[in-house]
C-alpha cells in the first residue's frame, strides 16, 4: 500500500469513527482529499488548536457567548474579561477594518482577503499578550481564544469559497460561517434586498468549505447560515427543494419571489445540517418562540445538532423584550441547543459610543473628562484590566527584554526604564 493510499484510508477511518465527524456528510473520498494536499505537509497550529478548543467548549459549556471584535486590542480585552471565544463580523470589517481602507455597508464591497487579514491581526495581538504574560510570569489567562470569522456569501462561487476558507485557516480562524445569499447582491441580514441562491448551490459551497479544511488538515468549525427567514428573492427555480416557496412572480432583474419566513428557513436548515457543524438562522427580532420553533424542527430530524444565534445590535432589545427576559435570553437559548451566541457589532458600538462620550465630555470639561476615563481604568484593574499602563500593554517591556538578551544585559537604551509609566503608573 502506498503512503498516499494509507493516508487516505486513515482519513476515511477518522471520518467514520471519530465522534468529531458524527453526522457530517462528505460527497468525496479521502483519496480525493489527499490528491489535493501536495507533497509537503504544512501545519496550521492556531487554526487547528483553536478549532479543537472551540469544539470542546461547544460540548462542555451550556453555551459559548462572544462579542464582535474589530481590533486586536478589543480581542485582548474580551479575553482578559473572561470571554472564551472571539467573533469577527464582516459587517465590522466592512465598516472600519478592511484592506481597501474605506467605510462600507455590509454588502461584500471590500477585498475578499480583508477578514482573513483581521483574523491574523487579532491572533498576533493575542500572541503578544500571551508573550507579555509569559515573560512577566504572572497571570493564567489563556489568550489563544478561538476566533469564529465571517466569510459572508463566499465572495463568488464554490472555488472562491474554497480559497477563502483556506485563507481563513492560514490566518488562524477556528470557525467560519457562510450564508446562502447571492454573493454579488449580498446584504446584511437585517437589510432588505437579499437574494438567496438555490439550496443545492448553498450546499456545494458548504462542501467546498469542508473540502478546503480537509485539504489543510484542520477540523475547522463550519457554520451554515440561512437568511431565508427574511429573504424573499431567489436566483433560480431550478432546485426542487425551493420550488414550494416560489410564488411565480419575477423581478426586473430576473429573480424569483419567494414566501420568506421561518418555514423556508427551517427547510434550508434541514438541508444544510449534514454538511455543517452548526446551523444559524438569521432572524429579524429577538424571539425565544421563533428560536424554539427553528430548534425543534432541526432537532426532530437531527437530534443534538448544534445551533448558533446572532444576538444582534440591529434589534432594539428593550422595544422587543422586557428586562427580565433580556437578562436570561442567552441562558434560554442555550437550553434549546444554541451553543454559540454572539453580538456581531459589539466592537463597532463600543468603539463609537465610548469615543463619543469621551469627546462630548472633553468638549465641555477638557481634561476633567479624560481624567475620569483614566480613573475608571484604574478602578477596573481589580477585575484584571491592565491597559492603564499602555506602554506595558503593547509590549514595551517585552522588547526591552529582547534588547537585553541581544546585548547580554548591558543595553542602556531600554524604553520602560526612565519612562513616565514607570514613575507614575506602578501597580
UniProtKB/Swiss-Prot annotation:
Establish whether keyword Metal-binding is in the entry: yes
| Pfam (any one) | ICL
User: EC number(s) on record?
Assistant: 4.1.3.1
Any one GO BP annotation for this protein: tricarboxylic acid cycle
Name the cofactor(s) required for activity, per the record: Mg(2+)
Gene3D superfamilies of this UniProt entry?
Answer: Phosphoenolpyruvate-binding domains
Question: What does this chain do?
Answer: Involved in the metabolic adaptation in response to environmental changes. Catalyzes the reversible formation of succinate and glyoxylate from isocitrate, a key step of the glyoxylate cycle, which operates as an anaplerotic route for replenishing the tricarboxylic acid cycle during growth on fatty acid substrates.
Family in the record: Belongs to the isocitrate lyase/PEP mutase superfamily. Isocitrate lyase family.
Assembly and interaction partners: Homotetramer.
**Protein name (database record):** Isocitrate lyase
To which species is this protein native? Halalkalibacterium halodurans (strain ATCC BAA-125 / DSM 18197 / FERM 7344 / JCM 9153 / C-125) (Bacillus halodurans)
Origin organism lineage: Bacteria, Bacillati, Bacillota, Bacilli, Bacillales
